[in-house]
């Protein structure tokens, strides 16, 4: 069920804008560096430092935008690179917001049209045969005279090395492999696709008629008609359901997915042919890309990255970049160059797209990650050669972590770095996967790379240990292994080390937690103090334990009532707290503000706690209640303090269900040297290797004589024999 959710969406999907900057020439001869953002439904250009620009249709200059009727239009000031700006230009930009984007409602309306009902994903990989149609426009032929041979080799040839340029002195343009090579490698031989390449055919449309993807249906239908005499489309209904399994269109010329290009050009995407039948079969899913990489005048043949990205949509895999840009609350931090379904398709001018990740292999059915649930030392080998990853389930249903090793070799040669990547995969919301919104909300990414150093841009410090030498991750680190809802996982990872062969070893600890809840239902009140279930509470400034009144006044019969300036303070805690939460109920007609603190042992000052969203001062509107969650580790012996900072002076708010989650010590098993929870022959082997000096271990001195030697091996064998009897 989970796998079906991860790959079973239906929509029109596209490659993200190429992240490479482009230098354009203004009409006066000056140059301007541009960056493109978004996809075929939502895109805009900025200067290198983030000021949005558009091309003025009247004079051809790129100018800083102005907002007119919720539309971005060319303003009056010609754009320049930062070092070339005049004082007047700098003054105008001082009050200009960076990364101004198209109106979110307009983008949402366009996206609503994408919810189509086509066939996606799960082919019989052994019976697959795809169709690729080369399509020229009436004003744009292919650059190579023999385009068919060029692209047939690029798509189908085994162990493809590249092609010879058509320059006066031809040279090899090297590629890492063909489309076939890419999928054969990413599936570990499970999928060896064959594509019939036909054409080029010419359609009676201009390259500028595409209008990104807005007029794609007309172009696609024209291409199907033009190729009809060359193809029996029924041959590509491999499952016999009356619908062609897929068609890929490769259009001549450039694409609007590169900065500085005409926005009327086609934007590569995947979608559904809405209503077309030929040769007795209907058409369903299609995908398309363009011939050229970058600026069309450069005539650089595009690599295979865009084809692999768009064809992956046909296999049912969603986009993993932020598909609505600044909508849904702003721009999200996405996998970037670490994923084919984000910016990884563009690596090395798309000639070396990064390989499928553990998630993408899982979603396509190429590999199932091994679940880990026992403590121990594990090794994960580079996914390019092993096709393997590990899975750790969180304490939230349908949410888990994936671990994989990436090495800068083969398809991963152009990744930003190498080491172990850790991904959080959250499939608790079916809609975001079904409608291609996986990473739209910056406050809740459903597919998140846990970057080792907590960065937000692609770097060699993202993997573990990486250049940041980050060797551990657990529930209390940044990043951490908690669920999105703050629930702690039952494991921690430490001693992460990478070997020269690209393998990464790590130690997995299984951590148990105990939850303590104060609900004030059975407490003893003695003046200003309350003996609770796990600590004593001090009530200050009119705080008291009171019967709840109404639906929004607590959970149960009793809670701690609070007025403005009331405080609830704990005694010193007998244990470390990893997660602290409580509910604050405001049944009054006034807005309340609540703050939460802790004080470490021996300290006099209180430290303000930030909740899971990074907020110290939490506003609770009248008639509402909130759950405040804190993941800061509170040391043993600390106190906590809840303060109603502002609020009603006469009508009370209520604090209830104060919850502390604390770790329970994991008692070591004597003789369990590899930490897998068992004492067996593998521990004997580990001890012998330690005595020989091949490895270092803890707990090897089993007889307590201060040395680790052969006598400890005898002790270990006796423990093993005793555990088996």
Where is each model-derived feature located?
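Extracellular carbohydrate recognition and processing domains
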Residues: 604-635
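Extracellular carbohydrate recognition
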Residues: 646-663
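Non-catalytic C-terminal accessory/binding modules of secreted extracellular proteins
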Residues: 143-144, 150, 160-174, 181, ...
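Active-site-proximal segment of zinc-dependent metalloprotease catalytic domains
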Residues: 96-334, 338, 342-360, 431-432, ...
């Amino acid at each position: 069920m989970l796998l079906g959710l991860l790959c079973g969406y239906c929509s029109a999907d596209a490659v993200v804008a190429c992240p490479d900057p482009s230098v354009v020439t203004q009409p006066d001869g000056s140059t301007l560096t541009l960056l493109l953002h978004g996809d075929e439904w939502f895109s805009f250009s900025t200067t290198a430092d983030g000021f949005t620009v558009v091309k003025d249709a009247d004079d051809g200059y790129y100018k800083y935008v102005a907002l007119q009727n919720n539309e971005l239009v060319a303003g009056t000031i010609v754009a320049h690179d930062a070092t070339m700006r005049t004082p007047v230009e700098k003054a105008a930009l001082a009050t200009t917001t960076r990364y101004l984007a198209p109106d979110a409602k307009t983008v949402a309306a366009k996206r609503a049209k994408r919810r189509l009902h086509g066939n996606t994903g799960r082919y019989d990989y052994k019976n697959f045969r795809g169709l690729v149609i080369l399509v020229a426009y009436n004003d744009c032929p292919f650059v190579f005279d023999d385009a068919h041979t060029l692209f047939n080799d690029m798509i189908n040839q085994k162990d493809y090395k590249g092609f010879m340029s058509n320059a006066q002195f031809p040279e090899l343009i090297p590629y890492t492999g063909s489309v076939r090579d890419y999928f054969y490698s990413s599936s570990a031989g499970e999928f060896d696709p064959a594509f019939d390449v036909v054409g080029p055919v010419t359609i009676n449309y201009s390259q500028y008629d595409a209008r990104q993807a807005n007029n794609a249906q007309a172009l696609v239908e024209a291409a199907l008609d033009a190729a009809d005499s060359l193809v029996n489309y029924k041959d590509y209904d491999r499952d016999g359901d009356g619908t062609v399994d897929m068609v890929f269109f490769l259009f001549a010329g450039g694409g609007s997915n590169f900065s500085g290009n005409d926005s009327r050009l086609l934007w590569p995407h995947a979608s559904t042919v809405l209503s077309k039948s030929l040769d007795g079969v209907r058409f369903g899913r299609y995908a398309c890309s363009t011939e050229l990489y970058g600026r069309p005048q450069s005539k650089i043949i595009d690599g295979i990255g865009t084809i692999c990205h768009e064809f992956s949509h046909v296999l049912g895999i969603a986009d993993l970049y932020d598909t609505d840009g600044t909508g849904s609350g702003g721009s999200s931090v996405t996998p970037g160059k670490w994923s084919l379904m984000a910016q990884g398709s563009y690596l090395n001018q798309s000639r070396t797209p990064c390989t499928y990740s553990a998630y993408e292999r899982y979603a396509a059915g190429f590999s199932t990650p091994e679940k880990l649930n026992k403590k121990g030392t594990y090794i994960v080998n580079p996914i390019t050669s092993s096709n393997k990853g590990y899975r750790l389930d969180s304490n939230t249903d349908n949410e888990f972590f994936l671990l994989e090793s990436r090495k800068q070799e083969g398809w991963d040669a152009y990744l930003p770095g190498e080491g172990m990547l850790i991904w959080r995969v959250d499939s608790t919301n079916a809609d975001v996967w079904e409608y291609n919104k996986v990473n739209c909300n910056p406050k809740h990414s459903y597919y998140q790379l846990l970057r080792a150093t907590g960065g937000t841009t692609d770097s060699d410090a993202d993997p573990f240990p990486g250049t940041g030498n980050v060797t551990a991750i657990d529930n209390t680190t940044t990043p951490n292994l908690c669920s999105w809802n703050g629930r702690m996982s039952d494991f921690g990872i430490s001693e992460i080390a990478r070997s020269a062969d690209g393998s990464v070893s790590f130690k997995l600890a299984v951590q148990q937690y105990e939850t303590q809840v104060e609900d004030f239902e059975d407490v003893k009140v003695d003046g200003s103090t309350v003996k609770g279930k796990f600590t004593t509470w001090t009530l200050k400034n009119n705080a008291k334990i009171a019967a709840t009144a109404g639906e929004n006044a607590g959970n149960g019969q009793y809670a701690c009532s609070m007025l403005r300036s009331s405080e609830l303070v704990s005694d010193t805690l007998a244990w470390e707290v990893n997660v602290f939460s409580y509910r604050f109920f405001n049944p009054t007609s006034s807005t309340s503000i609540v703050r939460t603190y802790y004080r470490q042992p021996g300290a006099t000052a209180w430290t303000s706690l930030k909740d899971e969203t990074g907020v110290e001062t939490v506003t609770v509107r009248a008639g509402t209640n909130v759950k405040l969650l804190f993941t800061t580790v509170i040391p043993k012996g600390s106190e906590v303090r809840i303060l109603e900072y502002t609020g009603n002076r006469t009508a009370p708010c209520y604090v209830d269900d104060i919850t502390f989650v604390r770790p329970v010590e994991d008692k070591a098993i004597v003789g369990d040297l590899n930490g897998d929870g068992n004492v067996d022959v593998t521990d004997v082997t580990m001890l012998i290797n330690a005595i020989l000096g091949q490895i270092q271990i803890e707990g090897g001195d089993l007889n307590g004589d201060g040395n680790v030697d052969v006598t400890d091996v005898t002790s270990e064998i006796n423990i093993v024999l005793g555990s088996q009897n």
